[in-house]
Amino acid sequence: MDEVELYVYYKLARRDAKRLREIAARFPQVRLLLKDDGSSSDPPTWMEIHTGPLAETGERAMAAALEGLIAGTRHVERFRPA
């Protein structure tokens, strides 16, 4: 089975950004991005990119760790090599 890449995006209040970065640091396979659209809206949109053989396991663990912090829905999109 091909490895997947998971692209996860959600809203998270700026006041929780430090906690998000601390949680993400526990997952070496994840990249954490902040949407840069020139807006100062709160809450901003964050994106996680999970890659490698532990992408799905890491995504589930990170979702559990972030429970209660995210404002609204956590959107997960799956991609595989073409």
Model-identified regions with their sequence ranges:
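Short S/T/G/P-rich N-terminal loop/turn motif that feeds into the first structured element of a domain
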Residues: M1-A61, T73-A82
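Large eukaryotic, non-enzymatic subunits of multiprotein complexes that serve as scaffolds/tethers
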Residues: A61-E67
